[in-house]
């Protein structure tokens, strides 16, 4: 196959023919030189254009250069303002931090187990304070609260949580009574009792707690007098007494001896407040400060009455000089009583009736027997049982 024989490409040949470097033509060299020349020219043009751009950019005024061109006076003023602001900020910063710390105290969220433990502790603390107040006299209770004022707040925190579970709050019942009876004229049948001359309704809340009764009554009469005609407006005053001044409405006092003159009140309220072992002294004080035909309103927990209905309690208050009006026992948790202080003419009529029936001596002996019994055993142990919660 001579036609396909190519020099250097024969399979049979032992040597392979390679291209020789020296055999390159001068044309190839010229082409390479031209290409290199073009590259150098393009690089030079690029470098020149970049240099021009740099010069143009440098000629444009920057923010720093503009700031340098501002007059020195304005710059000095701005510097002074900035330094004064910094000083004020530095001085006010710690004060603001203190305020924030006071206004926003860090509160750690308790776990469910910790919440249960806290509830048990507060409950046991409330029960202990409650037992103390029911089993000591009023002067001892006043001394205790003066020495440890935090006990008053702890007790009322626990008491508030207890009453919230009740179907009805006795304070609300008393406020509703005042609202309802206020619609009738003062001293009229079914109306509220007022002082004889001024017809002012004067209420004494004995053992007021946080004086919620005074707050609600004041708000009611304020709104009532705004809408009422001039001749229908009501004059009123509320005195609130307890062992600690929890707010401005309260006067600190032992409620067996309050700073009020004789016959200066028309309604005296004991709302779950007959707590001391000497609570009949509170009743005597109520009789002293009540005006004739003034009313005594009492609400007490049902479990305190040994007979379940409070008949023995009513009889004891009759011996103290009060006339019984009505007992309200429809509530599951507490019983309400209404008494009034008879005027002198009714007392005289009653005395004459008892003499005709030859029972006056019997009544006097019953009073003496009651006082003798009180001297031996405090009425807080037999007439009204202390409200002591079961230990768990």
From Swiss-Prot:
- Pfam families annotated for this entry? Methyltransf_8
The subcellular location is: Nucleus, Nucleolus; Chromosome, Telomere
Q: Which reaction does it catalyse?
A: adenosine(645) in 25S rRNA + S-adenosyl-L-methionine = N(1)-methyladenosine(645) in 25S rRNA + S-adenosyl-L-homocysteine + H(+)
GO BP annotation list: ribosomal large subunit biogenesis; rRNA methylation; rRNA processing
Residues found modified as Phosphoserine: 62
Output the Gene Ontology terms for molecular function.
rRNA (adenine) methyltransferase activity; rRNA (adenine-N1-)-methyltransferase activity
Basic and acidic residues compositional bias, start-end: 39-57, 69-92
Q: Which residues bind S-adenosyl-L-methionine?
A: 156, 207, 242, 254, 271
Coiled coil start-end: 32-61, 344-382
Q: According to its record, what are the GO cellular component terms?
A: 90S preribosome; chromosome, telomeric region; nucleolus
**Which portions of the sequence form the region Disordered?**
1-96
Could you tell me the EC number(s) of this protein?
2.1.1.287
Q: Which domain of life is it from?
A: Eukaryota
State the UniProt keywords alphabetically: Chromosome, Coiled coil, Methyltransferase, Nucleus, Phosphoprotein, rRNA processing, S-adenosyl-L-methionine, Telomere, Transferase
Tell me which InterPro entries the record gives.
Answer: RRP8 (IPR007823), RRP8_N (IPR042036), SAM-dependent_MTases_sf (IPR029063)
Task: Please list the residue ranges that the record marks as compositionally biased, kind Basic residues.
Answer: 27-38
Miscellaneous comment: Present with 2780 molecules/cell in log phase SD medium.
Relate the protein's function as given in its record. Answer: S-adenosyl-L-methionine-dependent methyltransferase that specifically methylates the N(1) position of adenine 645 in 25S rRNA. Required both for ribosomal 40S and 60S subunits biogenesis. Required for efficient pre-rRNA cleavage at site A2. Also involved in telomere length regulation and maintenance.
Stated family? Belongs to the methyltransferase superfamily. RRP8 family.
Question: This protein is called what?
Answer: 25S rRNA (adenine(645)-N(1))-methyltransferase
Q: Which organism is it from?
A: Saccharomyces cerevisiae (strain ATCC 204508 / S288c) (Baker's yeast)
């Amino acid at each position: 196959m001579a036609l396909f024989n190519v020099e250097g490409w024969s399979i049979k040949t032992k040597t392979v023919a390679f291209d020789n470097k020296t055999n390159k033509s001068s044309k190839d060299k010229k082409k390479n030189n031209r290409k290199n020349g073009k590259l150098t020219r393009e690089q030079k043009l690029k470098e020149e254009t970049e240099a021009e751009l740099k010069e143009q950019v440098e000629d444009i005024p920057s923010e720093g250069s503009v700031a340098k061109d501002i007059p020195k006076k304005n710059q000095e003023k701005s510097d002074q303002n900035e330094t004064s602001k910094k000083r004020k900020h530095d001085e006010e910063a710690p004060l603001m931090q203190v305020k924030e710390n006071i206004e926003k105290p860090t509160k750690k969220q308790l776990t469910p187990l910790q919440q249960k433990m806290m509830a048990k502790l507060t409950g046991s603390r409330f029960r202990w304070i409650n037992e103390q107040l029911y089993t000591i006299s009023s002067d001892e209770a006043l001394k205790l609260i003066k020495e440890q004022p935090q006990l008053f707040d702890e007790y009322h925190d626990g008491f508030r949580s207890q009453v919230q579970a009740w179907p009805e709050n006795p304070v609300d019942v008393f406020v509703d009574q005042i609202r309802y009876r206020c619609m009738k004229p003062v001293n009229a049948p079914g109306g509220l009792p007022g002082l004889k001359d001024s017809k002012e309704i004067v209420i004494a809340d004995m053992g007021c707690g946080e004086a919620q009764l005074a707050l609600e009554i004041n708000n009611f009469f304020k709104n009532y007098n705004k809408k009422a005609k001039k001749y229908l407006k009501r004059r009123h005053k509320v005195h609130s007494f307890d062992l600690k001044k929890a707010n401005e409405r309260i006067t600190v006092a032992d409620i067996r001896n309050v700073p009020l003159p004789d016959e200066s009140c028309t309604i005296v309220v004991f709302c779950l407040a007959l707590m001391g072992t000497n609570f009949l002294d509170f009743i005597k004080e109520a009789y002293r400060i009540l005006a004739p035909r003034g009313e005594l309103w009492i609400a007490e927990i049902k479990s305190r009455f040994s007979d379940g209905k409070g008949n023995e309690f009513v009889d004891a208050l009759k011996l103290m000089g009060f006339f019984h009006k009505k007992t309200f026992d429809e509530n599951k948790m507490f019983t309400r009583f209404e008494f009034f202080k008879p005027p002198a003419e009714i007392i005289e009529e009653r005395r004459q009736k008892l003499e005709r029936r030859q029972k006056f001596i019997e009544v006097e002996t019953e009073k003496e027997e009651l006082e003798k019994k009180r001297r031996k055993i405090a009425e807080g142990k037999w007439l009204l049982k202390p409200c002591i919660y079961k230990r768990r």
